[in-house]
């Protein structure tokens, strides 16, 4: 078309020059008629010479003097690239469909793009046979083939300005037989998978009574608003008030139910409904607890010497206090907080003999340790009593010395309140030194 317009301009300029030179007195109407005829002949010759050109119909182009303008876009103004929305449209498309045109060129472009996208997915309409059907007037085999290919392709694979909208996530097409049966499951099962059938145990007599009389209880006035616990409580009271003759009826019903249940499920047991078969967690044994002779050191005097040998017990055990020889499971010693004396079962005393080879004291057993401690305390108490008696006799003249009562001395030894605190402190320090030497 560019060649046709250039040729028309050249003819127009040539005729104007020729008219000005040869016949300057020709009227305006005659010159315009002659110019239109010449332009018609030139365009016809150019179109007949070009291969694949569309022949004009009845001098359509000769009668219409079309010039490119923003309100009337010519085919030469439309982009014809491979990715353009106008690549598959016929050449005379803007002139055939003028109702989609607008004075605004941007709106014209959007109208063209929208129409092409609509026609790409729609079947060919018989209202526009000259635009899309391959006939002698508009032989467009390439356009028809391209449109046929686009019609066979899915919507989301077609090239076009609205192809991005076609990429939206939509459910794939599936035949009616292959559709998932979600609706059917929701209609029948409520959307929940049915669990395996749970075998219930047969009903007893009271359950049969409650099953039969619960609807009657609900029909009574005021019971429809009560909770289930209140209704069960009322049914229990009525069951206890029921005579034995009437209760026997429900016992027979329960017996028949048990027999039928046993015939139906011969291998069933009520233990299957409870957690009897579950594995119980094994209790881990405390590794700190040792067995044999080592465990003997952790026992108290009562467990170590027995109930009959109370003379071998330590003083805290005799007074039902914490034992000074027993140790807890962590290995630490249990000390008596009242009298402040505490030592291990393997401590040594002053009477133990040392080895001549290695100069290390030999540990004594528990009875020897207790006896040594008693002897030490008795000796210290006797020495203190003798010292006090001698000082008293020398200090007082003309008086007879007091007679010592052995029962009083024994009671003083047994009771901690009569022992001098200084002696107790010295005894504790001595015992601590001996225990350090043993360790």
Swiss-Prot record:
Tagged with keyword Transcription regulation: yes
DNA-binding region positions on the chain: 199-269
S-S bridge residues: none
InterPro entries associated with the record: HMG_box_dom, HMG_box_dom_sf, TCF/LEF
Annotated GO MF terms: beta-catenin binding; DNA-binding transcription activator activity, RNA polymerase II-specific; DNA-binding transcription factor activity, RNA polymerase II-specific; histone acetyltransferase binding; histone deacetylase binding; protein kinase binding; RNA polymerase II cis-regulatory region sequence-specific DNA binding; RNA polymerase II-specific DNA-binding transcription factor binding
Domain of life: Eukaryota
GO CC, any one term: beta-catenin-TCF complex
Protein's UniProt name: Protein pop-1
Upper lineage: Eukaryota, Metazoa, Ecdysozoa, Nematoda, Chromadorea
Gene that this sequence comes from: pop-1
């Amino acid at each position: 078309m560019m060649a046709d317009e250039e040729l028309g301009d050249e003819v127009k300029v040539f005729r104007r020059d020729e008219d000005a030179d040869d016949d300057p007195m020709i009227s305006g109407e005659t010159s315009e008629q002659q110019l239109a005829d010449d332009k018609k002949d030139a365009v016809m010759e150019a179109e007949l010479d070009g291969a694949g050109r569309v022949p004009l119909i009845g001098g359509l182009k000769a009668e219409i003097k079309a010039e490119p303008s923003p309100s009337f876009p010519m085919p030469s103004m439309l982009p014809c690239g491979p990715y353009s929305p106008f690549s598959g449209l016929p050449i005379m498309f803007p002139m055939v469909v003028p109702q989609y045109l607008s004075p605004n060129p941007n709106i014209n472009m959007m109208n063209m793009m929208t129409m092409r996208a609509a026609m790409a997915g729609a079947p060919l309409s018989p209202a526009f046979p000259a635009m899309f059907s391959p006939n002698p007037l508009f032989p467009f085999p390439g356009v028809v083939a391209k449109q046929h290919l686009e019609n066979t392709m899915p919507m989301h694979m077609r090239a076009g300005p609205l192809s991005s909208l076609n990429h939206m996530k939509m459910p794939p097409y599936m035949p009616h037989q292959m559709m998932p049966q979600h609706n059917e499951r929701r209609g029948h099962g409520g959307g929940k998978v049915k669990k395996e059938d749970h075998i219930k145990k047969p009903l007893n007599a009271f359950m049969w009574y409650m099953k039969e009389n619960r609807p009657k209880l609900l029909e009574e006035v005021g019971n429809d608003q009560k909770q289930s616990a209140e209704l069960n409580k009322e049914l229990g009271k009525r069951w206890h008030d029921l005579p034995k003759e009437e209760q026997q009826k429900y016992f027979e019903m329960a017996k028949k139910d048990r027999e039928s249940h046993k015939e139906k499920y011969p291998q069933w047991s009520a233990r299957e409904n409870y957690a009897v078969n579950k594995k119980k967690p094994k209790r881990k044994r405390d590794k700190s607890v040792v067995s044999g002779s080592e465990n003997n050191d952790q026992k108290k005097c009562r467990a170590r010497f027995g109930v009959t040998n109370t003379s071998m017990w330590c003083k805290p055990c005799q007074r039902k206090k914490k034992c000074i020889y027993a140790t807890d499971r962590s290995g630490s010693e249990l000390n008596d907080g009242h009298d402040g004396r505490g030592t291990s079962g393997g401590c040594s005393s002053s009477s133990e003999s040392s080895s001549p080879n290695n100069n290390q004291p030999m540990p004594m057993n528990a009875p020897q340790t207790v006896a040594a401690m008693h002897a030490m305390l008795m000796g210290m108490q006797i020495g203190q009593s003798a010292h006090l008696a001698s000082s008293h006799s020398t200090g007082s003249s003309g008086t007879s010395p007091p007679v010592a009562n052995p029962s009083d001395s024994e009671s003083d030894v047994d009771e901690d309140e009569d022992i001098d605190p200084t002696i107790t402190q010295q005894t504790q320090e001595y015992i601590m030194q001996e225990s350090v030497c043993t360790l």
